[in-house]
């Protein structure tokens, strides 16, 4: 009898042990899952906090120097442009996509930034072709004069606005001055962390969103400052463009051909920086050798109808709205006839998009004109 009781106890103990073992395993898994979840949550919170601080300390470029906000605006656009302009201020202050649409039905966008260097233009072009293949790319050739990195401030206004990509990494590597570091572009918080003690109202207002500062890449100015006497450029020891500039122009030419895009070279009608005849001859020769179109608008200012007493806001460096609209009408006809760009007016979705854009365009024009009138009456 006692033996049977002992056997029953042993049997029950054997039954209990596997069940207890299973319960322990389940309990351990739950604990482990909670630990993993807590670790993941901690990492997410830390990364989110760092991202938030980074977004807070990065310059917003909403007032004053707004050029740093231009590059990023492109990503919110529908990617179905006929023409993409790529280059420096000689494009984004001198060409009005609104006029090209209203008068020629050409849908265009300017991927411009201050002192955009030719290698930056190339990598912006490379990146753009991942989003869309326009019929024409227009490149302003003023940046052919540069063959070395220039300034971190200008680099930042182009590169910080680019989305992360291999094109951005290569653009950074090509652009950095000796004092700059790649890691500070990849993680801008490392560069801007000191701004945490210098934050302004804009840093909080535009933390999660930014207002548009351009109209399809065009920066509008309606004020007027007449051009005075423009001196000729100082003599140079060597007028030849550097081989690095030609290397990137060759890359642009090849990239456009590979993608079935027509590359058009232009020189905007800015009175200075001075554009030497020797520089112009090199561009004419390059265009001839590569079967490209090249237009130097400095040679046709009278045909365009430009008056540098009324059509510039800074003495001839850039055109104001009046001058930009004149140049856009002139160039729009060239794009339509010589680049065979048909009018897209009548496309419902595009018409609706431009209706909203034109409303904002004329609203800003009116606002600036009213402000200018008030300033003149002071």
What are the functions of these language-model segments?
Residues 56-79:
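Alpha-helical transmembrane signal-anchor/signal-peptide segments
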Residues 37-55:
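Hydrophobic membrane-insertion alpha-helices, especially the h-region
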Residues 277-352, 356, 360-378:
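C-terminal regions of proteins
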Residues 108-114, 237, 241, 316:
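Acidic/histidine-rich helix-loop elements
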Residues 86, 90-172:
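Membrane-embedded segments
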Residues 154-259, 347-378:
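Secreted/periplasmic serine-hydrolase-like ester/acetyl group-modifying domain
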């Amino acid at each position: 009898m006692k033996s049977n009781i002992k056997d029953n106890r042993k049997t029950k103990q054997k039954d209990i042990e596997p069940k207890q073992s299973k319960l322990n395993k389940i309990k351990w898994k739950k604990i482990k899952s909670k630990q993993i979840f807590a670790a993941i949550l901690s990492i997410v919170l830390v990364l989110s906090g760092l991202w938030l601080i980074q977004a807070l300390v990065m310059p917003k470029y909403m007032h004053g120097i707004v050029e740093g906000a231009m590059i990023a605006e492109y990503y919110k656009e529908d990617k179905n442009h006929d023409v993409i302009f790529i280059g420096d201020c000689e494009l984004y202050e001198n060409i009005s996509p609104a006029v090209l649409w209203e008068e020629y039905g050409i849908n265009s966008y300017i991927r411009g930034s201050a002192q955009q260097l030719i290698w930056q233009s190339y990598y912006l072009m490379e990146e753009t072709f991942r989003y869309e293949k326009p019929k024409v790319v227009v490149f302003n050739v003023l940046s052919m004069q540069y063959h070395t990195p220039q300034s971190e401030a200008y680099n930042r206004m182009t590169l910080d606005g680019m989305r992360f990509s291999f094109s951005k990494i290569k653009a950074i590597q090509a652009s950095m001055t000796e004092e700059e570091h790649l890691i500070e572009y990849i993680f801008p918080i490392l560069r801007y962390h000191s701004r945490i003690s210098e934050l302004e109202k804009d840093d909080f207002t535009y933390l999660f969103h930014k207002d548009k500062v351009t109209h399809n890449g065009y920066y509008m100015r309606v004020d007027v400052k007449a051009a005075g006497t423009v001196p000729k450029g100082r003599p140079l020891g060597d007028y030849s463009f550097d081989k690095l500039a030609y290397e990137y122009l060759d890359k642009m030419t090849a990239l456009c051909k590979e993608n079935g895009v027509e590359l058009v070279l232009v020189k905007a009608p800015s009175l200075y920086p001075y554009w030497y005849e020797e520089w112009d001859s090199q561009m004419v020769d390059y265009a001839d050798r590569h079967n490209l179109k090249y237009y130097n608008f400095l040679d046709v200012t009278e045909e365009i109808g430009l008056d540098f007493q009324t059509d510039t806001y800074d003495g001839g460096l850039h055109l104001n709205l009046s001058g930009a609209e004149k140049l856009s009408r002139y160039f729009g006809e060239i794009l339509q006839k010589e680049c065979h760009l048909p009018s897209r007016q009548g496309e419902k979705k595009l018409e609706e998009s431009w209706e909203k854009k034109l409303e904002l365009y004329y609203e800003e024009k009116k606002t600036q004109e009213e402000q200018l009138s008030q300033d003149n009456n002071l």
